[in-house]
């Protein structure tokens, strides 16, 4: 699983994570390159990966209120898909963080990161609702030639996978 490095605190789970560090240091950049290389190796060896395309937790579009929206998806996943041609299974995760998280997210990144850890810890041992779509083999997306088009294609598929929850 490619995941925010702040969430890689459990030593038993660390071997299953490929951490992405959002701090703006040379060391973070090196670690991120390494994680991306390992993601490619995993796909080349047929190991399934769980990837969160925007790289961020969805946040309310107004400070503490409003609809929760994804940050723009990066084209990194499209690059992996185009290079390694895996079968892709879209998953939509339901749920929302607390209002306090959304308020903190609009103040400053350090507050957001602190609240991110708090929200994750609160979710341990709880049920996560998700919708799983049909798999997409390389033949289903081989006609797509640009990373941006591939990103948009799978974004639309994930959004279409979402089912209404009461």
Stretches with model-predicted labels:
Residues 33-166:
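Non-catalytic C-terminal accessory region of glycerolipid acyltransferases
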Residues 1-30:
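Catalytic core of membrane glycerolipid acyltransferases/transacylases, capturing the structured
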């Amino acid at each position: 699983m490619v995941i925010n490095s702040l969430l890689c605190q459990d030593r038993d789970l660390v071997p299953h994570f490929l951490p992405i560090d959002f701090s703006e240091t040379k060391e973070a950049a090196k670690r991120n390159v390494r994680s991306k290389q390992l993601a490619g190796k995993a796909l080349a060896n047929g190991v399934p990966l769980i990837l969160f395309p925007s790289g961020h937790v969805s946040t309310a579009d107004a400070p503490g209120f409003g609809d929760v929206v994804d940050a723009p998806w990066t084209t990194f996943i499209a690059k992996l898909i185009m290079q390694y041609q895996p079968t892709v299974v879209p998953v939509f995760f339901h749920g929302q963080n607390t209002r306090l998280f959304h308020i903190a997210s609009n103040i400053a990144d350090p507050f957001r990161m602190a609240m991110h850890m708090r929200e994750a810890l609160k979710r341990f041992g709880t049920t996560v609702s998700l919708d799983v779509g049909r798999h997409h083999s390389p033949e289903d997306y081989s006609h797509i030639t640009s990373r941006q088009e591939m990103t948009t294609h799978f974004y639309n598929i994930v959004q279409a996978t979402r089912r209404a929850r009461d």
